[in-house]
Design a protein with these regions (language model features):
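Signature of Asx- and small-polar-rich beta-strand/turn repeats characteristic
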Residues: 1-321
Length: 321
């Protein structure tokens, strides 16, 4: 121990190691050693997916096997919208048209995520089986500066539904030409002209958009404007909404009768740490294939993040009649 070791050193032959002063110093050294050992143990735990506790560590380790945790997902509902009175050869419901509902005394807004046009049938203007998403549309822009080596394109909200994310690149502030980029699902087939973007979860549960390096995916240029358009959600709170009213207008008309086809459902928060630990190695082993039962289970869970349980079996497991 420390007392025995120090008492055997020539420099401390005249010291009384039973004295209160020396005992206090030895206690400090012992405590320091204990805490260093504890910190080293905790640090070692965070180095492995199985034992990591911090979300940032789990996300980083999952990234090493090419797995991106799923974002929050917006609650969705399906409705029929009968607009009356209305006129014209056609009627267009603009993207972002708002519908309101109330769940447990709290008001929420739903929006449609694409322009929808219809023509009247026997004079009736009806949008059938319209899918609406809970949340509000937000827009964020970055101007690319290649001289800033630390520049990042982070979506500044932690409840974004990345499935609704639209990424566009405007040439410059003086050139309004824009190109829409798509989410890269892999690197196969990518080249220097591929207009794709990549996603990764970063600190605070937010998501970062990044682009190719000019070899795997087209690189952004100095002065380009990155436009991020997305829905920010209230996670699972609006699930169960049953009735909706039109908050905005449809083609300038504000009177509408709304029938709910399916109640609001599917809203979720960020993928849990336990789910990331389970899915990351299986997603890596599946390699986007659908061959084994485990492959199918992994793919289904990645497509339907709100699924509470997935059961898969192959014909080889079925009992012979």
């Amino acid at each position: 121990n420390l007392k025995t070791f120090l008492s055997q050193q020539n420099e401390f032959t005249d010291y009384d190691f039973e004295g209160s002063g020396m005992s206090t110093l030895l206690d400090v050294l012992a405590y320091n050693t204990h805490y260093l050992g504890y910190n080293a143990n905790m640090l070692a735990n965070e180095m492995y997916l199985d034992s990591a506790d911090l979300r940032s560590s789990v996300v980083s380790l999952a990234k090493q096997v090419g797995y991106t945790p799923t974002s929050c997902t917006s609650s969705t509902a399906t409705i029929d919208v009968l607009v009356s009175p209305a006129s014209g050869a056609s009627l267009t419901m603009s993207r972002g048209t708002k519908f309101s509902t109330t769940v447990d005394g709290q008001s929420y807004s739903f929006v449609n995520n694409a322009d929808v046009s219809i023509t009247p049938t026997d004079g009736v203007y009806k949008f059938s089986n319209l899918k609406i998403h809970e949340g509000s549309y937000l827009n964020y822009k970055y101007t690319v500066s290649t001289s800033d080596i630390d520049q990042r394109f982070i979506i500044p909200n932690d409840s974004v539904d990345t499935t609704t994310l639209t990424v566009k690149i405007q040439e410059s502030s003086s050139d309004a030409t824009t190109n829409t980029y798509t989410l890269a699902s892999g690197i196969t087939g990518l080249d220097s002209t591929s207009k794709v973007y990549f996603l990764q979860e970063v600190e605070g549960g937010r998501f970062e958009v990044y682009f190719g390096d000019g070899v795997l995916g087209k690189a952004v240029a100095d002065g380009n404007i990155v436009i991020l358009d997305y829905i920010n959600t209230n996670r699972d709170a609006p699930n169960g909404a049953t009735s909706f009213t039109l908050s905005g207008t449809v083609g300038g008309f504000s009177s509408a009768t709304i029938t709910t086809i399916s109640n609001a459902s599917g809203g979720t928060g960020l993928e849990s740490i336990a789910s990331i630990k389970y899915n990351a190695p299986r997603d890596y082993s599946a390699q986007d294939r659908a061959v084994t039962a485990e492959d199918y289970k992994t793919l289904v869970k990645s497509l339907y993040a709100n699924a509470q349980a997935v059961q898969v079996y192959g014909g080889e497991d079925a009992e012979t009649p």
